[in-house]
Amino acid sequence: MPRTTAWEARANRAERIVREVRAALPEPVREAAAAVAVRLDRRVPRHWLADGVEPDSLGLFSGPSMRDADASQSDEAPLVSLFLENIFDWCGGDEDAFDEEVERTFLHELGHFLGLEEDDMAPRDLD
């Protein structure tokens, strides 16, 4: 039987956390969030680094938000990307802190899909 790598274990944990967080969202938010895909990367992909995304970013929302008037006309789907090795490093290798930060980062990026700006995140403890 093949062994699970540390990366696979982290990705499995993150998938479970995102699934649980989505299920716990209030109904209207949960319905809206169903349109958002989630991508788990080790680190920030090169093409985003070339676009100016910081290499130590924990997550990123891309695509149209709910505030975009022409969101239904966009060819790009809403996407939350989580950079799991960056999150793990940020948490100093602490597994419990990793779980909490995956949840927090997912909610932060989902907030951008819902139309929240960075200043809107702090009162929700998502900054």
Please place each PLM-identified region on the residue numbering.
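Active-site rim/adjacent substrate-binding subdomains
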Residues: 1-101, 113, 117-122
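Short alpha-helical catalytic segment bearing the HExxH-like zincin motif
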Residues: 101-109
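Short hydrophobic/aromatic patches at helix-to-coil boundaries
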Residues: 124-127
